[in-house]
Regions:
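Intrinsic low-complexity, intrinsically disordered segments enriched in polar/basic residues
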Residues: 2-4, 41
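Bacterial N-terminal signal peptides that target proteins for export
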Residues: 4-16
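C-terminal motif of bacterial Sec signal peptides marking the signal peptidase cleavage site
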Residues: 24-28
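Exported/periplasmic ABC-transporter solute-binding proteins
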Residues: 30-259
Length: 259
């Protein structure tokens, strides 16, 4: 874990970013006409590609534009997001999936753990989007899941974090298609914590956090966990301001968020 200024940041899992549908994920989110034409010529389909992007503030978007070079940086270090202005904006993972599922010409991006039979993941450099390929390094498009808290964490919130990082919590993360950070974690030891805990942030992290909440409340009925879905930036702001106990981010944290 990392300790910086106001927040404690813990990485509790990782996942792969999967482009959806069988068109070129690399070209899909740029605004280069050369890339767009290459995608069309390399595909058996024809016609315009409907780009679906996550909203500003989304950790998924931030990770995607960085990993694929869609975000550029000038000599002064100023960053520019070159996602095409024609992109359809999906403000949650579920909306992204629905948009891509309902449009055979659409291409978007989501976490591997969110994938379903309704969409198809794009191979990257010939590698399929699987947990095994992320672990062996052949599928290189992956990013961390992080949680952040203020230093003065309640006993109930700390106990829930302990559960997430225990062997029990890490198994839930693995069972749901994500990459655990500690395959040698110790079993969860139930304590006497009680109270309410609010977890807020990334819609990509929310599904697995809901699974962790359900399992934790099954072994500790004295703690009530509320999971609020928004985006990574909102989650980090809420944790910093103390309006939630634990913030969720599906990307690396920015310097401005860690102190």
């Amino acid at each position: 874990s990392i300790m910086k200024a106001m927040n404690k940041i813990k990485r509790f899992g990782a996942m792969s970013l999967a482009g959806m549908l069988l068109m070129g994920a690399l070209a899909g989110c740029g605004n280069s006409s050369e890339n767009d034409s290459k995608t069309d010529s390399d595909s058996s389909a024809s016609g315009a590609i409907d780009v679906v992007s996550r909203e500003d503030g989304s950790g998924t978007r931030g990770a995607f534009i960085e990993l694929f070079g869609i975000e550029t940086k000038d000599a002064s270090g100023n960053k520019t997001d070159n996602t095409t202005s024609d992109a359809i904006i999906a403000n949650q993972t579920e909306v992204m999936m629905q948009n891509v599922q309902g449009d055979e010409n659409a291409i978007g991006y989501a976490s591997l753990g969110s994938m379903s039979d309704s969409v198809k993941a794009v191979k990257i450099d010939g590698a399929e989007a699987t947990t095994e390929n992320v672990l062996n390094g052949s599928y290189k498009i992956s990013r961390p899941f992080n949680v952040a808290t203020k230093s003065d964490l309640s006993a109930a919130a700390q106990d829930f974090l302990n559960y997430i990082l225990s062997a029990d919590g890490q198994k839930i993360i693995s069972d749901n298609g994500y990459i655990p950070v500690d395959d040698k974690a110790q079993a969860y030891q139930a304590g006497s914590a009680s109270g309410d805990v609010t977890v807020a942030g990334s819609s990509s992290v929310t599904p697995v956090m809901e699974k962790l909440k359900e399992a934790y409340e099954g072994v500790n009925k004295n703690v009530k966990i509320t999971v609020q879905e928004s985006d990574s930036t909102t989650g980090m702001t809420s944790a910093s301001e103390g309006t939630c106990d634990i913030g969720m981010a599906s990307r690396e944290l920015k310097d401005s968020e860690t102190g």
